[in-house]
Amino acid sequence: MATQPTGSLRYGFFLNPKARILFDTWIGVRPDDILLSPSGGMEDEFVAHLKKYLFFRTKASIASLTGAFRSLTLVGREAPAYATPLFSSDPAEDGLRILAGGGFAFLHPHQFAFEREAGPWIDLWIPRETFEKTLQDLERRVLSAGGTILSPEAMETYRLECGIPLSPFELNEGHFPAEAGLDAVAVSYNKGCYVGQEPVTRLKFQGQLSRKLTGLRSKSPKIQETACPRPLYSALDGSEAGTLTSLADSPAAGGVIGLGYVKRAHWEPGTALIDGTGQSYEVSDFPFVSPD
């Protein structure tokens, strides 16, 4: 990140020595520090991991800002219009925006994922003392314009509709970055030595994937069982085909959709799979729904 300009926002992985995913994080560059925002509610584990390496950089320090802020997320085509009035006017800002009233925003470039456009996705980090007023103002503006306030369950459905992997469901120590389709944006192949560099580079230039993240459409009208992960099998011969990682009922997509890691022999769109409960699926491309 030393070469990135102030105001830039990047996405990256922290890997284990075998190049499996430990954490994924958004990285924002400010004039005097760097913001790190791990996904999946894993802040404590992430901070502990970073502190293990502090002795290599004695001039660095780590501090948690979580207690000073509360967050909310804007998604959809109109999200930038709702967020822009909150920004400062610094022209140097890019994906990281400073809020005029304190706090900051991450403008996620989710279109990088799988080279598909996932639509605007903006995380706002607002000082706790002004959060309730800011939230009320935003909700009023969104509702008056015909927008919707999404519950946590609805946000999860939206994530799956866009085909966005999330820690710890799709992004965890069981998978390589390339299996999630994110190695091109979250891993450097020309940076100096880092944990996991050798095996992740070897996979890139010498190996081939044995499984990858795919979309899944259920042939059942309703979710019979929501617990994940669960194994997937070929509907033809019962052979092991992969793992279902996330599942949701999406009226916009026309039924039950999910994400999962599927083996090479079964990952072609249209391939029929079943899980251990007898629920049937069909491998599908994503996003399931065109972004608004």
What are these regions (language model features)?
Residues M1-A2, L74-A79, R217-E225:
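Short, surface-exposed ligand-recognition loops at beta-strand->loop->(often short) alpha-helix junctions
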Residues M1-L9:
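Intrinsically disordered, low-complexity, positively charged segments
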Residues G7-S8, P17, I21, T25, ...:
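Glycine-rich, small/acidic residue-mixed loop/short-helix segments
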Residues G12, P17, E170:
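A glycine-rich, hydrophobic loop/mini-helix early in the fold
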Residues W26-P165:
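Acidic, low-complexity central loop/insert segments
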Residues A83-F87, L135-Q136, L171, T226, ...:
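Short, charged, solvent-exposed linker or helix-capping segments at domain edges/interfaces
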Residues W125-R217:
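Anionic-ligand-binding alpha/beta catalytic cores of soluble enzymes and soluble regulatory domains
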